[in-house]
């Protein structure tokens, strides 16, 4: 299972890459494998605001429809619109071109609620 060290993680299998007061958010390798082939992605609008753990996107796969939850509260600065035409990028490159949104962090203290790569890897061992 691919768990990059430079990211933080949630128990719902989202990742976040923080850069100053902004961050990229996506779903983990584990999540995309569990979902199967992604066939549709519903993304929020730029300037939409979400609280921590609030659903902000929907991934539809051949197996299921799944909500994606924001690891920390924030305002959407950019949505990865390439996924609207190529939803399979979530499967192919979940940590690169398969990212979902870029957000402006509302409260950096919420990052303390997230798991490091080591903690997430241990968590995956428990759930598998």
Curated annotation (Swiss-Prot):
Binds 1 lipoyl cofactor covalently. GO terms for biological process: glycine decarboxylation via glycine cleavage system. The gene is gcvH. It comes from Halothermothrix orenii (strain H 168 / OCM 544 / DSM 9562). Pfam families: GCV_H. PANTHER family: GLYCINE CLEAVAGE SYSTEM H PROTEIN (PTHR11715), GLYCINE CLEAVAGE SYSTEM H PROTEIN-RELATED (PTHR11715:SF3). GO terms for cellular component: cytoplasm; glycine cleavage complex. Transmembrane segments: none annotated. This is Glycine cleavage system H protein. The keyword rRNA-binding does not apply. Residues 22-104 form the Lipoyl-binding domain. Belongs to the GcvH family. Coiled coil: none annotated. Signal peptide: none annotated. The keyword Acetylation does not apply.
């Amino acid at each position: 299972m691919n768990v990059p060290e430079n990211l933080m993680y949630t128990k719902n299998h989202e990742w976040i890459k923080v850069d100053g007061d902004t961050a990229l958010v996506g779903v983990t390798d584990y999540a995309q494998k569990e979902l199967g082939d992604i066939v549709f992605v519903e993304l929020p609008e730029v300037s939409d605001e979400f609280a921590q753990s609030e659903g902000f996107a929907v991934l539809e796969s051949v197996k299921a429809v799944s909500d994606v939850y924001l690891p920390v509260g924030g305002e959407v600065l950019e949505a990865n619109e390439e996924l609207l035409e190529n939803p399979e990028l979530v499967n192919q490159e979940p940590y690169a071109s398969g990212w979902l949104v870029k957000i402006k962090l509302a409260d950096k203290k919420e990052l303390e609620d997230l798991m490091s790569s080591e903690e997430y890897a241990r968590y995956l061992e428990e759930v598998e």
